[in-house]
Amino acid sequence: MATKAKSVGQALEATATKRIRKLFGNIHEAVEMPNLIEVQRESYEQFLRSDPSIGYVSGLEKTLRSVFPIRDFAGTAELDFVHYELEAPKYDVEECRQRGITYAAPMKVTLRLIVFEVDSETDTRSVLDIKEQDVYMGDMPLMTENGTFFVNGTERVIVSQMHRSPGVLFDHDRGKTHSSGKFLFAARVIPYRGSWLDFEFDAKDIVNVRIDRKRKLPVTSLLYALGMTGEEILNHFYDRLVFERAENGWKVPFMVENWRGSKPAFDVVDAKTGEVVFAAGHKISPRLANKAAKDGLDTLLIPTEEIFGRYSAYDLINESTGEIYIEAGDEVSAENLEKLDAAGIDKLVLLDIDHNNTGPWIRNTLKADKAEDRDQALSDIYRVMRPGEPPTRETAEALFAGLFFDPERYDLSAVGRVKLNMRLGLDAEDTVTTLRSEDILAVVKELVNLKDGKGEIDDIDNLGNRRVRSVGELLENQYRVGLLRMERAVKERMSSVDVSTVMPNDLINAKPAVAAVREFFGSSQLSQFMDQTNPLSEVTHKRRVSALGPGGLTRERAGFEVRDVHPTHYGRICPIETPEGPNIGLINSLATFARVNKYGFIETPYRRVVDGKVTNEVVYLSAMEESKHTVAQANADLNPDGSFIDELISAREAGEFLMAPREQITLMDVSPKQLVSVAASLIPFLENDDANRALMGSNMQRQAVPLLRAEAPVVGTGMEETVARDSGAAIAARRGGVIDQVDATRIVIRATDMVEPGKSGVDIYRLQKFQRSNQNTCINQRPLVKVGDVVRAGDIIADGPSTELGELALGKNVLVAFMPWNGYNYEDSILISERIVKDDVFTSIHIEEFEVTARDTRLGPEDITRDIPNVGEEALRNLDEAGIVYIGAEVGPGDILAGKITPKGESPMTPEEKLLRAIFGEKASDVRDTSLRLPPGVSGTVVEVRVFNRHGIDKDERAIAIEREEIERLKQDADDERAILNRATFSSLKDLLVGQATSAVPKGLKKGDIVTEEMLVGLDRADWWKLAVVDDKAQTALEAIKAQYDDAIKRINAKYEDRVEKLQRGDELAPGVLKMVKVFVAVKRKLQPGDKMAGRHGNKGVISRILPVEDMPFLEDGTPVDIVLNPLGVPSRMNVGQILETHLGWASRGLGQQVTRALEEWRDANPDATGGEMPEAVREKLEHVYGAEYVEDIRSRDAEGIIELASNLKVGVPFATPVFDGAKEADVSNMLTLAGLDESGQSDLYDGRTGDKFDRKVTVGYIYMLKLHHLVDDKIHARSIGPYSLVTQQPLGGKAQFGGQRFGEMEVWALQAYGAAYTLQEMLTVKSDDVIGRTKVYEAIVKGDDTFEAGIPESFNVLVKEMRSLGLNVELSSYAEEDPDEGPEALPEAAE
């Protein structure tokens, strides 16, 4: 068990010293979990970077090579691709985020233009001229370290797509097409790009072929087009039998397989002996047939009538006269036989079709085919593909050759070829990516075999037949489309200019290629705005696999089978995590250990089992490869030597679960976690939850808002650290070293390992402070290290949002009681204690971004200024002299964030206006106030302001101040880097120089002196370099240090100057924009009724009431509970995991309190302990709590380490209970007992209002609760007046449009039912779309009057207009006022 402790605190890294998670898992993982965002990184890396050392060509280069060389139409010039290179990006990620631009690298492509001279007589070409040139071909977006892209300043993720693998698929219609219910088999050859080829049986059992789903043709037409004759076709698909005439019948060889299971209608006689072998009408069993063969039966005698109805294999022709006796494929009949008798032919070669094992399908198709040779077949194919065009032989040839045999137009891809080879047992190289005749024949042969009942159809939903296209491949395909568009333009340009005088640059217009890339990143369905709510949602988004998108499925068309969980998903795709709703099953998540192989298939790792012993050798297998193995589960019991303990092992084979004998096992799972995705693996006791609730649990963790103070779960699964690290939320040290400086905004590390010449010896980590995420949550990083700490590469040095001590921390551990409380937890409502609000337990910070732009309008430029017409000083209190809000200002709804004025058109002035203008100056009249104001419902603190100016526009004071601050920051970084470099360099210089004899010295020293420390201290640093020493070796080292130092200083200065230059340069703003101001407002959101909360087990609810602490139920020792949940939410939903979590959390807290008590007692007993003394009592308590496996780890710590560890256990002792390998019921009981608590996990509770004890014990414990991103503040909304829709004149809907509440059909019924006529009339008229009426109501209310009249709703007018547009003239007429009994007035003539 020592390994168990080790895996928790391996050689203690910076965060592991502060906390140990007690692990309940027993299964040792044989392989490390791959990096969680490897899928994205690997794929893009393969797209961008070639590796000549291993002969790997990047996807980008492949694409360029597939389009180049481009030749002009006359063949006089050729533009060829040599190589490409990506230069350094102009701006780094942070600059792109701030400026709103794309993070990309300029791409230079070296092209070679070759000009030929064509000799028209001999038709040969000779090279006239070769020109090479680098051409700029736009910017290629780069991926950040975290697997995302910055496009126009927003972070996006390219989701991987799952699609049908190229290759061949065999299927049948499940008897749905034909009324008889017989299966119609079909085969489909799917290329990566090019025409689809479908083969199918129809109801008459004829084999047809369709190209690109066009009209069907007999399959033999396709075979004719491949150059086969009728005879060749028949002889390829059928065996031949030779029949020889005997006196009383025909002799035929005895083939065992043809007779097994058949029932002859005649006596079958042995030709040699004349004995009856098989009697007529009796079924021949396989045993009987085999026995006959064994006894030496080799030739049978069958009656002549038995030959009738068989088919000839060849044409039989009279050589001399040319008369055809019988054609290949014709039926043998009595007349034919007579002719053959007359001709003296006594040997017949017939096709081996016995209608039992082999059916006449191809022969029937051949006979039904109207085409008889290649030319007819080709013209039939041409007519189907190009209806309405008359075929000529050449065009038909060219069309057919281009369909499947031209690499330009048809590409199976390496994957397609591999799949084809595997399915059909071929052995073509995977570089052959077009179809061959033998491929087509093999497909038809397999289809016919299926019809004959041999072989199995394929399962489309098997992961062996679906593959993943990741970023690199998706972009490659898109770029190819762009290049092909470019190719057309280049060809036209080549034919219209004089090629001998141009350079490659003049021919290439890279716009189409650049546009294709931009379109892909900007608007493709798979390029998505990153879900950045918390680190887990980021990781999950990057690991998502979607079946939707271009070339994929659509929601409406996807049936149940595609969405369902398939046995091959095991270890590859998570069966739990998928959205609820219309996308269920179409959007999936990769399992934890899964990875995508070079062909795009998802692989999962297994341990090899050799001779019944499990080895530590790990193999990654795709679904196709796995199908041949029997795989044991990860939890199978093993002996210490790796052999299985039990005789029968629970295993999987070909998608079935079975108990297999141990000798049969060939592989074993690596870990129980490999089944589920990252989000599901974070749910403790997942094995005790119902699948539907686990699904909700894993989806809701992604919506947890990062809280003000993160707190890792006391009951975790051990995956928390992995997610925090791989998501990039927590910062890991790039190289080992010593912490040199730390403050809230940056960490400076002096590197001690991987220090190479030409590489800085200093790592500066800038922490993100109060940055806005895509979902408006707050990204804030905090350092975890102190100056002087030694860190190793990979240690966590700073926490990010939702992480604590390098572990994912999405929520809080809170004390929960399961009991009803006065109906406040009815229907999943949640009752919470006021303490939670007061102590900011679930408070989160949200950052909203507001921006305003000053444009150049027709009437003059807009201006951002403090000088706004008709605005009092009170409204301007937060603005500086440039008219922009201060950082730190508290702002509320309607407050001005940036003052802006827009010129308005001149209108003739009244005398009063002229007078005002003369008195008060210009401004007031010709501009209007268009300032940026805070929208309703938002209030908070301004945390950041950014000002962007167009090139050549003077910067205002605010912009200059911001720029100065930024330059100061850069200068500090450069100074620090220099200082550390100086310290390190001069210290190694001192070690080198002291004790050496000098050969050259600066002024004031004597040559030949021995260098001493005092001498160096007295010298100025710059003079140290003037020293030279006698010893050659030392002198060489001295010069090397000098060169390295100069190089490093140069690099630091260059970096600084480059950054400053970028800052001082103007910004690239959209056309017409002169200036842009962005203001970021941080809003503190406390928990309040209406907010949604959830646990990790799908137990979600809305807060119904916040109760004063004194009214909450309390425990025996007076501790009030934090949350009261409804016990009825558990049984029907079957998510029992939450109860086990409650118990274990309760035990954790109990143990934590024991340790805290021991620590306090020790402190009381040793008030003046300096920190060097070992707190023995505390250490013993820790050993007692953690158990034997952790003793070694605890004893290896010093006194300070023990105290730090103990003081971190206040909240509770952290547990890790991995999914499917976690704490059992007994473990939970043991922990409760160890903590000195009741084993039932229940406690006596007292009512906070009366002090009375509740009748029975209540389950109380600690649960990890999350606050979800569904906050009532974002949803609550009210409208008094606001915008109306143009046509219907009804208020708009929704909070974003400041709309009203819809009063729909059903609500109208409700008012009708109550007879509330006046309310109903108001709702349908003056409160909605009676334009005149609502204006009158407004006027009346303003005057204090409350009588009003309803008019005609606008929607009625719309209806009338619509009817008129149909030619029905509808007019309204009123009853005559004098005589109410009279009918309506007659309509005018037009209506008749």
From Swiss-Prot:
UniProt keyword Chaperone present: no
Sequence similarity: Belongs to the RNA polymerase beta chain family.
Keywords: DNA-directed RNA polymerase, Nucleotidyltransferase, Transcription, Transferase
Domain of life: Bacteria
Record's keyword annotation contains Transferase: yes
The organism of origin for this protein: Sphingopyxis alaskensis (strain DSM 13593 / LMG 18877 / RB2256) (Sphingomonas alaskensis)
Function (record text): DNA-dependent RNA polymerase catalyzes the transcription of DNA into RNA using the four ribonucleoside triphosphates as substrates.
Reactions accelerated catalytically: RNA(n) + a ribonucleoside 5'-triphosphate = RNA(n+1) + diphosphate
Region (Disordered): 1372-1392
Record-given protein name: DNA-directed RNA polymerase subunit beta
GO cellular component: DNA-directed RNA polymerase complex
Self-association and partners: The RNAP catalytic core consists of 2 alpha, 1 beta, 1 beta' and 1 omega subunit. When a sigma factor is associated with the core the holoenzyme is formed, which can initiate transcription.
Broad class of enzyme this protein falls into: transferase
One BP annotation, GO: DNA-templated transcription
A GO molecular function held by the record: DNA-directed RNA polymerase activity
E.C. designation(s): 2.7.7.6
Species lineage: Bacteria, Pseudomonadati, Pseudomonadota, Alphaproteobacteria, Sphingomonadales
